[in-house]
Curated annotation (Swiss-Prot):
InterPro entries: 6hp_glycosidase-like_sf, EDEM1/2/3, EDEM3_PA, Glyco_hydro_47, PA_dom_sf, PA_domain, Seven-hairpin_glycosidases. Involved in endoplasmic reticulum-associated degradation (ERAD). Accelerates the glycoprotein ERAD by proteasomes, by catalyzing mannose trimming from Man8GlcNAc2 to Man7GlcNAc2 in the N-glycans. May also participate in mannose trimming from all glycoproteins and not just misfolded ones targeted to ERAD. May have alpha 1,2-mannosidase activity. This is ER degradation-enhancing alpha-mannosidase-like protein 3. It comes from the Eukaryota.
Length: 931
């Protein structure tokens, strides 16, 4: 997400009839007032060091952009591990995330205005020519309306804005004649059919060539869309209208915003995550500031800044008051139910909320922005990157990190608002982590698991559009930028739109369809910029004083948010039945459950599910007791499963030219050397003969002292391990024989033994899917000598590695101890469903609504539970691990089955919890919402 370029750090008004000079002056005044909050709290960074870091950002951008142009263009995105372009239809489907790809050179368009911000005007001119020459917007492909708007339409408009700026300066782009604007207008008209609904909310997808509903369009049957998807259009559509004079675009975007405002929950003033585009009914009724809603709030405030329409600010202020009243539990931002805003909807937060501190800076609410940003920074320091989702006690919930820019964005705006050099140090940490953990020979690779350091073959276009832009601006002085950044507003994709658009085409109707606005008693809602010298007099350490109590919040404390006694559980009250005491065969216990509104459902597989219907409880107090009982079930289940899991392992390629930059996610074995308890194993790789490793090796001299590569199939894993161990191998990597399999699209599992005593196997054994294994095989074909590191977690890359002329000795193995693996904490038995590549196509037997709570347990009375109304505090006052654990699958191989079926252990308790669907939908929403 992104913030406005002008008017930083305040909620200042852009006058509706202001001249452009007054608008610019207002923006400049806001910045002057906002930058005086503090100038201390960290050692000042010298201009030389800032320039050095700025130059480092430029080099990193060149590495990413250059590799895209060399290896991927004209494809939409670069696949940095395999050094090729991602072309839709030619790669395995990743689900909704692929809806951003339209065969229109997405990364190039998304990077246009970044080139100008980074003072690469020649490259910008070349890129514009390539877009005009090569890009086709009439492809027969179904794309996301939201992603196409913010990335492609926004990219074209941002490129046009800076092209006309450069042309006016008289040095570059003298040939330019609004060609990018013409393309933007063409694309705008292609998106308009999506708005053909009774509500005015757009369909989530559209076919660029055939539109909606036609048989050949393959879309138009959807009924739901996310709030952000429908509410993040006004900036681009209004800019298109004001650039071209065609008012229809702004009118359609305004109608969608008006409808969302009308459908807000009137008592809480919150909006849900997904809405029916035909009826306006809320489909998912949880509300937060992260995935699915985030940029809706952002665009209300920025639409006011860009367009000068008071109604947008009034709506934003109403929502912001509700956010701070219900969702903000400093330093946390926790989702709640729109109808029951005092009850938390979940106990985890997603990475997209990292944009919110930056939006609060634009609003002028600095203190909570500093608090939340510092909390997020502590999570990053623990995991190197911000996990896609993390729990309220800061454990990993979803381990992926697709190189999101939102935290860098908030860091930039907090620095501009406070002048505190602390935020320069934060930016420096981001640069170091990107180079240390994400940089690969062909660009920067997304992190598949922040705990192991494994990579995903993915570099999204927003990484170039946003990350480098914000990092460069963080360290740049005004003279380093060839234009005045304060004259522009940033879209959610960090594209630049000129503020002078507020004075053009003002004939567009601003009919107020809002009922009434809530009177809000808050000085932050003033229509002028706050004077920070008055707000924070003589306190240069203001920001530091706010951060200090949060320094150890991740490692040493368990923040519990605000305890809402008046709306939550009775303080000190105990439920009549504790989860640990419950017995399904006890009639008295069943009667107590009935009183609390909890019923038992016997499932076909012999398990029992607990479901709470609050309205069926004997009283509101009993309903609260039932809710607490369900929460205890979750905690009990989590604790029971903690010690039953084995975490994934890592295979790290450390020889030239990789130097540890490529990390592959590997499955462990239930036998052999345990890498979490022993030293890592380092060695060169060699293929075994026979390749399946099912008989005595015929090339023992080739694998002696090396890590043997073996193909899956034909015999047991343990038999393969014994054969390569007898040949002198120091470790083994089993590569899947199912072509195209990948840890991106299949659940990781443990290699099981053969039913015999496996204590004789002393070497470590790891499993790689076909896609990951092919990376090693390709490296062998190209470089012959390939050295890898087998460990429980990717080793920090030593700078000395890249200075070594020759690879280390082939016999140099098991040197340097690995760090202890962080506990695995993903959703139980859902490794194959959490990924966006796996849509939620199998659900638990019961699917209660948002007013229901559900839990399941096995007949053995290993009980667990789930509730949508999670609180952040444990009942006994201790920090409780609320992470859901991944159920690793064990698998043996049969002699005569080349296509081995994957058996799993009995379905664990939590896999039937009632909020399973919501959890999966939330992850998929993150992939839709500017992943």
């Amino acid at each position: 997400m992104s913030k406005a370029g002008g008017c930083r750090g305040c909620g200042c008004r852009v006058p509706q009839r202001a001249s452009w000079s007054l608008v610019a002056a207002t923006a400049a005044l806001c910045l002057v007032l906002a930058t005086s909050v503090c100038t201390a709290g960290a050692a000042p960074m010298s201009r030389e060091e800032k320039q050095k870091l700025g130059n480092q950002v430029l080099e990193m951008f060149d590495h990413a952009y250059g590799n895209y142009m060399e290896h991927a263009y004209p494809a939409d995105e670069l696949m940095p591990l395999t050094c090729r372009g991602r072309v839709r239809g030619q790669e395995p489907s990743r689900g909704d995330v692929d809806d951003a790809l339209g065969k229109f050179s997405l990364t190039l368009i998304d990077s246009l205005d970044t080139l100008v911000v980074l003072n690469k005007t020649k490259e910008f001119e070349d890129a514009v020519r390539k877009v005009l020459r090569d890009v086709n917007l009439d492809n027969d492909v179904v794309v996301s309306v939201f992603e196409t708007n913010i990335r492609v339409l926004g990219g074209l408009l941002g490129g046009h804005s800076l092209a006309i700026m450069l042309k006016e300066k008289g040095e570059h782009m003298q040939w330019y004649n609004d060609e990018l604007l013409h393309m933007a207008k063409q694309l705008g008209y292609k998106l308009l059919p999506a708005f053909n609904t009774t509500s005015g909310l757009p369909y989530p997808r559209i076919n660029l060539k055939f539109g909606i509903r036609k048989p050949e369009a393959r879309t138009g049957t959807e009924t739901d869309t996310c709030t952000a998807c429908a509410g993040t259009l006004i900036l681009e559509f209004a800019a298109l209208s004001r650039f071209t004079g065609a008012t229809i675009f702004e009118e359609y975007a305004r109608k969608a915003l008006d409808f969302l405002w009308e459908k807000r929950q009137r008592s809480s003033n919150l909006v849900g995550v997904t809405i029916n585009i035909h009826t306006g009914d809320w489909v998912r009724k949880d509300s937060g500031v992260g995935a699915g809603i985030d940029s809706y709030y952002e665009y209300l405030l920025k639409a006011y800044v860009l367009l000068g329409d008071d109604s947008f600010l009034e709506r934003f202020n109403t929502h912001y008051d509700a956010i701070m009243r219900y969702i903000s539990q400093p330093p946390l931002l926790l989702d709640v139910h729109i109808h029951k805003p005092m009850l938390n909807a979940r106990t985890w937060m997603d990475a997209l909320l990292a944009f919110f501190p930056g939006l609060q800076v634009l609003k002028g609410d600095i203190r909570p922005a500093i608090e939340t940003h510092e909390m997020l920074y502590q999570v990053i320091k623990k995991h190197n990157f911000l996990p896609e989702a993390f729990t309220t006690d800061f454990r990993v919930h979803w381990a992926q990190h697709p190189l999101r820019p939102e935290f860098a964005e908030s860091t930039y705006f907090l620095y501009k608002a406070t002048g505190d050099p602390y935020y320069l140090e934060v930016g420096k940490t981001l640069i170091e982590n990107l180079n240390k953990y994400a940089r690969v020979p062909c660009g920067f690779a997304a992190m598949k698991d922040v705990r192991t350091g494994s990579h995903e073959d993915r570099m999204d276009s927003f990484f170039l559009a946003e990350m480098f832009k914000y990092l460069y601006l963080l360290f740049a002085d005004k003279e380093d930028i060839i234009f005045d950044i304060e004259d522009y507003i940033f879209t959610t994709e960090a594209h630049l739109l000129p503020l002078w658009l507020s004075t053009t085409n003002r004939s567009i109707s601003k009919k107020n369809t809002t009922s009434e606005y809530t009177e809000l008693d808050d000085s932050n809602f003033d229509w002028t910029c706050p004077n920070t010298q008055i707000l924070f007099p003589n306190d240069p350490l203001y920001a530091q004083s706010i951060r200090e109590p949060l320094k150890n919040v991740v490692d040493k404390s368990c923040p519990r948010g605000i305890i809402r006694v008046e709306e939550s559980f009775r303080s000190g009250a105990k439920p009549p039945l504790r989860a640990r005491d419950f017995m399904a065969t006890n009639p008295e216990h069943l009667e107590i459950l009935k009183k609390m509104g909890v019923s038992l459902i016997h499932l076909k597989d012999g398990r029992v599910q607990l479901v709470q219907h609050a309205i069926q409880a004997a009283s509101s107090i009993d309903a609260e007791d039932g809710l607490r009982f369900m929460q205890e079930m979750i905690e009990l289940s989590s604790q029971q499963q903690k010690e039953q899991q084995l975490p994934p392992r890592a295979v790290q390629i450390i020889s030239h030219p990789f130097f540890g930059r490529v990390v592959l996610t590997a499955g462990p074995a239930q036998f052999g050397l345990d890498l979490s308890k022993h030293k890592e194993t380092r060695g060169f790789v060699a293929s075994s003969k026979p390749y399946n490793g099912c008989s005595e090796l015929t090339n023992p001299e080739a694998v002696m002292g090396k890590i043997a590569l073996i193909q899956r199939g034909q015999c047991m894993f343990a038999e393969k391990a014994r054969n390569i161990q007898n040949a002198g191998a120091i470790g083994g990597i089993v590569i899947d024989d199912n072509e195209g399999s990948s840890s991106d699209t299949a659940p990781l599992f443990q290699m099981a033994g053969d039913g015999k005593d496996t204590d004789d196997i002393k070497i470590p054994m790891l499993f790689l899917f076909s896609k990951e294994g092919s990376i090693i095989l390709d490296a062998i074909r190209e470089h012959e000598q390939v050295e890898v590191l087998l460990s429980d977690k990717a080793r920090d890359r030593d700078p000395e590695m890249e200075n070594e002329d020759q690879p280390s000795s082939e016999n140099d193995s098991q040197n340097q101890s690995a760090e202890q693996m962080l506990s695995l904490s993903q959703t139980v038995d859902l490794a194959d469903k959490e990924s966006p590549e796996h849509p939620a196509d199998s659900h638990s037997e019961a699917s209660p609504s948002d007013s229901e709570e559900a839990a399941g347990f096995a007949p053995s009375e290993q009980i667990s539970g789930s509730t949508e109304n999670h609180e952040t505090t444990s009942l006994d006052g201790e920090c409780t691990d609320l992470d859901n654990q991944v159920q690793e699958q064990s698998e043996t191989e049969e002699d005569s089955s080349p296509n081995v079926s994957w058996g799993t252990k009995a379905q664990p308790i939590d896999s039937i919890l009632a909020d399973w669907n919501e959890d999966i939908e939330a992850f998929e929403m993150m992939e839709k919402d500017e992943l």
